[in-house]
A protein has these predicted regions:
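A domain-level signal for the structural core that forms small-molecule/cofactor-binding pockets
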Residues: 2-62
Length: 62
């Protein structure tokens, strides 16, 4: 039972997440042979003030 965890900055729409989940599921199925119905995709929406890159919070960028 493959589990794919996706962490993203908050702000994606439900449609965007649905499209990502479908593509990820297809890719995992294609390369692992796991049945689509057992492939799980989870999304973690991270607020800009809770994610940093290079020591700088995303809330401090643009």
């Amino acid at each position: 039972m493959p589990i794919v965890q996706v962490s993203l900055l908050a702000g994606r729409t439900e449609e965007q997440k649905k499209a990502m989940a479908e593509e990820i599921t297809e890719t995992v199925n294609k390369h692992s042979g796991a049945p689509k119905e057992v492939i799980t995709v989870t999304f973690s929406d991270i607020e800009r003030d809770s994610w940093a890159a290079g020591g700088i919070l995303y809330s401090e960028k643009n």
